[in-house]
Amino acid sequence: MGKDLNTLINRSGSRMAMRFVLVTRNRGKAEEFSQIFKEYGFNFRVEPMAAPEIQADDLREIARYSVLYAYKVLREPVLVEDAGLFIKALNGFPGPYSSYVYETIGVEGILKLMEGVVRRDARFESALAFYSPLTELKIFTGAVEGRISEEPRGRGGFGFDPIFIPDGSVKTFAEMSLEEKNRFSHRARAARKFAEWFKTLKTLPPIYQD
């Protein structure tokens, strides 16, 4: 996945000056970040490395642990994200355990838990962690309020996208184009906060990909 995705992200030249490494095995997530970072003219590469996730109730702590682990392995400026779906009627479940819950009970399992629930308020959150030895560890967060749909809708996106409708839209994330989703999503909001900060840096040297 990494090679194909890096070809998609960086089309010009075999030796590109890179500024950071995005660590993720999720192609959809990488494509969402890619579209936003291209708006800022950032060059980066994707590393499909499995960064371990600690069991914690705070997305920021999970992202913090993962980014430091990734840096120890790669020794390059690294960016790692953790995200979660927080459903009010389920007391914030699945929250920071969203990936595990999706893999075990999936979208249908969440809808089953929500059977008969009228108030379907939910929130997607993102914690985006960056680390370089020339900067302190930084975490950027983003959130979007919305609601859980009555049934899965759409074929785009990934994870719980087919059942989440952000406020201000009648579509689920899975029914949106990439451009539409990036106008609403928690991930896009965190990414833009990071990008606004990162573009001001003067001290990071480029790294290179052959």
Language-model segments: which ranges?
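Short helix-onset patch at the extreme N-terminus, typifying the N->h transition
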Residues: T7, T24-N26
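Anionic-ligand binding patches
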Residues: A17-V21, G28-D210
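N-terminal amphipathic/basic-hydrophobic helices that include classical n-h-c signal peptides
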Residues: M1-R15, Q209
